A protein has these predicted regions:
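Start-transfer (signal-anchor) and selected internal transmembrane alpha helices
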Residues: 1-25, 218, 383-390, 554-570
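Hydrophobic, aromatic-rich transmembrane alpha-helices
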Residues: 2, 204, 289-320, 557-560
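Membrane-embedded helix bundles of polyisoprenyl
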Residues: 15-18, 106-118, 122-207, 218-237, ...
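Membrane-interface coil-to-helix junctions
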Residues: 18-108, 130-152, 254-279, 324-332, ...
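Periplasmic/ER-lumenal interhelical loops and adjacent helix-loop junctions
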Residues: 40-53, 57-60, 216-219, 223-301, ...
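Transmembrane alpha-helical segments
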Residues: 107-114, 154-166, 200-205, 294-301, ...
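Signature aromatic-anchored transmembrane alpha helix within multi-pass, membrane-resident enzymes
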Residues: 220-227, 360, 366-401
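Active-site-proximal, structured, solvent-exposed surfaces of multi-pass membrane proteins
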Residues: 461-570
Length: 570
């Protein structure tokens, strides 16, 4: 086990260069719009920034997707995160690409520390970092526009501090901060669930190997502390998801025959299809692992099996998990019956951790071979081993450049921004254009935790902004901003009006009149005569979450003070 201070000065510089290399295909077209899910995630980065900059409001609600949906407490939306500053300063298109750059740097650095925690050399630590965080798997997801996957950069940091905290108990604080940053950013859904599954299982296996419960105890403590710090977002989000469950794919599976293409094939692109049962595009499957890395991993298992068997179990478990539902006892079938994991889809995302486990074993195997060869003094053999390491790294670099170069194919378009917001129907995949035009996209891509699209659409495709359900009334004026809707109404009679905005229990009328959901849309009663109706949105349970976050911060601050305070000499 090593200390943070053991990092050589050249290592951070190397990781900065690697991060620039991986992000460069995006940075070379820094203002271009991305393909596929870039449209969706560029939009949900732009909306909170625009809510602050255009309206001076806190980003509680997103009126721009699917007829209106949650924003602040959505698990894949960044607000209370340092990355939000990038969106505010540079805009969402450029800000997300800078986020990729930063996250690659953090991911390489954290991966290096995690490897060093298991006793590998500096060179082997670099090998692990590039074999794992520089893998095809991450390049495919980032090229696809899956911004939540950038927040896997905090996984190795969380795991590292949890593992090291059995010697330095206060490092639980650093683990908690890593988890907090993941949740407050884009990583509160898939990355969070898999990070806790991976780290928890690793701690159990290490505890069994070493006969210690400290790993698991520290993992639980760090998880509670991290989620406590992030409770201002996490708690409202969990309550929302419990009340509005979104379905996963419990029956999804990958045929065993596809594993060769997935792990050892040389054709990895966003636009390829390799097997008939391929449900998703290739970004959900590609997990290239160099055969040379596998050979090094096998070396570690042959020579140090009693010490390294936990990594073999990890690789086997996540391989089986990635295969999906192949029977009642399959890990996927079991886990998707549990809360939290029940909403998962894309079984191939579990292959991420097969790469991690094999890369760790490969780094250990590299060191073992180098140690043996240093004794034998075989120069040729040492050259061959180092060339193998260079080949592993070089292959990932080449694959990643080609894949990430596929991300940007659309130069920016000039879009006129309308003064008044309206819901509208446009071609799917144009949500960001709709946002720039100040139009809500009723036809938008599916997003985790969002309600299905809802709106007032007539049989001939006309989109209404409101509809008088009962009685008679005239809307003299309306002003719709993200968190506030204001209607100037003249009612000929009393009645009820349905708005074109999706209902959520966070909406409330300023004058206390009751609101109800009609076909998923906000409905309110109006009276006879002139009246102004103001509807405001606030994230439900926000203050409860904030109280838990502040209490967690105070508790961890007390722990830090207790550990760091100087002791009196006797």
């Amino acid at each position: 086990m090593t200390k943070f201070s053991t990092l050589h000065r050249a290592i951070p510089a190397l990781f900065v260069l690697l991060a620039v290399y991986y992000a460069l295909p995006l940075l070379l077209k820094i203002d271009w719009w991305g393909v596929r899910d870039w449209d969706l995630f560029t939009t949900i980065a732009a909306v909170p920034a625009g809510t602050v900059l255009h309206y001076g409001q806190f980003p509680f609600w997103n009126p721009y997707l699917g007829g209106g949906n949650i924003l602040f407490h959505h698990p894949e939306v960044t607000v209370l995160s340092p990355f939000f500053l990038l969106y505010l300063i540079f805009g969402s298109v450029v800000g997300l690409k800078l986020q990729v750059l930063v996250c690659y740097g953090l991911g390489f650095g954290g991966s290096y520390l995690l490897a060093r925690a298991f006793g590998v050399s500096r060179v082997a630590g670099v090998l692990f970092s590039v074999a794992y965080f520089g893998s095809v798997h991450f390049a495919l997801h980032i090229a696809e526009g899956h911004m939540p996957f950038t927040h896997y950069c905090f996984l190795p940091w969380f795991s590292y501090f949890v593992i090291e905290s059995h010697n330095r108990r206060h490092w639980i604080i650093w683990a908690a901060l890593a988890l907090m940053l993941m949740v407050l950013g884009n990583g509160g859904a898939v990355p969070l669930v898999y990070t806790l599954l991976f780290t928890g299982l690793l701690c159990v296996l290490l505890g069994l190997r070493d006969g210690r419960t400290a790993y698991l105890v520290n993992f639980v403590a760090a998880t509670i502390a991290g989620l406590g710090l992030a409770a201002v977002k996490f708690l409202p989000g969990v309550i929302y998801l419990a009340e509005n469950r979104w379905e996963g794919n419990p029956d999804e599976s990958i045929p065993f025959s596809a594993l060769g293409k997935i792990f050892f094939g040389f054709e990895h692109s966003l636009f390829v299809k390799h097997f008939d049962e391929q449900t998703w595009a290739w970004h959900e499957y590609g997990a290239y692992t160099s055969p040379l890395l596998v050979l090094l991993a096998m070396t570690a298992l042959v020579w140090r099996f009693r010490q390294q068997w936990p990594w073999l179990v990890m690789a086997a478990f996540f391989l089986l998990l990635g295969l999906g539902d192949f029977g009642a006892i399959s890990p996927w079938a079991i886990l998707t019956s549990l809360p939290g994991f029940a909403s998962m889809r894309g079984t191939g995302r579990a292959f991420h951790f097969v790469i991690l486990a094999v890369a760790m074993l490969g780094a250990i195997g590299y060191d073992l071979l180098c140690a043996r060869l240093s004794v034998s003094r075989s120069m040729i053999s040492r050259v061959v081993v180092n060339l193998a390491a260079v080949g592993i790294i070089g292959t990932n670099l080449i694959f990643a450049w080609n894949i990430l170069s596929e991300a940007n194919r659309q130069p920016p378009e000039p879009v006129h921004r309308a003064e008044q917001f309206r819901q509208a129907i446009d071609t799917q995949g144009r949500a960001f254009r709709s946002y720039l035009a100040n139009r809500g996209a009723l036809r938008s891509a599916w997003l985790s935790a969002y309600h299905p699209s809802r709106g007032l659409v007539t049989d001939n495709g006309e989109v209404l902004q409101e509809f008088v359900l009962e009685g008679e009334a005239r809307v003299n004026a309306r002003e719709i901003t993200p968190n506030v809707m204001t209607y100037d109404i003249t009612g000929s009679t009393a009645g009820r009006m349905v708005t074109g905005m999706g209902f959520d229990k966070g909406w409330a009328a300023a004058d206390g009149r009751p609101l109800e959901a009609v076909n998923g849309l906000i409905c309110f009663a109006f009276d006879r005569g002139n009246q102004k109706v103001i509807l405001r949105y606030r994230t439900p349970h926000l203050w409860l979450g904030l109280a838990v976050s502040l209490a967690s911060l105070a508790a961890l601050g007390g722990m830090w003070y207790h550990v760091r305070r100087p002791t009196r000499s006797s």
